[in-house]
Regions:
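Active-site-adjacent loop and "lid" segments of alpha/beta metabolic enzymes
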Residues: 4, 11-12, 16-75, 95-182
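Short acidic capping loops at alpha-helix termini that bridge into adjacent secondary structure
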Residues: 82-85
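Active-site metal-binding loops of divalent metal-dependent hydrolases
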Residues: 92
């Protein structure tokens, strides 16, 4: 949510995380978040939800996202939010072209700075359709593949639609180093 009163009420009702697609930029959002003990997922988005996909442009998408993360971390700390509470989300599909999204994924490790967890939401995204031309419900296998790529490149948290398939794939991926070491 991006609405401070909803953040406060969500925390009161037992939410485990505050996730704001606007990166806690609305007036009062950081103050409301600071008043909770919850972790914050700060997401990058160019523009606003209703216009974000209208010709998104960057000189350098990695620098743009990294600068946004630095700026928001400074703002979080100024609001009294401990660094350890901050999770970053590069905002796949939020004000980015498919090319931007694939570039971010390929270089995701470069966003893993300062020990902050990176959360990614790649499941069923339109970037998959840019390659496979499939409807969202037909993007399960590609979504699982993207989740694996993201974790391999440093993502700590993956937000998915197909939990069992993704969990199984990550379990197999995680078992590989153990079997090699034996």
């Amino acid at each position: 949510t991006s609405t401070p009163s909803v953040m406060t009420e969500s925390a009161r009702l037992g939410a485990g995380l505050l996730n704001d697609v606007r990166g806690f930029r609305r007036p009062g959002a950081l103050q409301a978040a600071a008043a909770t003990a919850l972790p914050l997922c700060v997401m990058h988005m160019q523009g606003e939800p209703d216009t974000m996909q209208q010709n998104p442009q960057y000189d350098d998408v990695m620098s743009g996202v990294r600068h946004f993360f630095d700026d928001r971390l400074t703002a979080c700390e100024a609001a009294g939010i401990a660094r350890e509470r901050v999770i970053f989300d590069p905002g796949f599909g939020f004000g980015k072209t498919a090319e931007h999204n694939f570039h971010l994924l390929a270089h995701l490790r470069d966003l893993c700075l300062g020990g902050h967890p990176i959360l990614v939401g790649l499941s069923r995204k339109s970037m998959i359709a840019s390659v496979l031309d499939r409807a969202p419900e037909e993007r399960v296998f590609a979504s699982v593949a993207l989740a694996l790529m993201a974790v391999e490149r440093g993502a700590s948290i993956v937000r998915v639609h197909d939990v069992a398939a993704t969990a199984d794939a990550l379990a197999m991926w995680g078992a590989l180093p153990r079997s090699i070491d034996r």
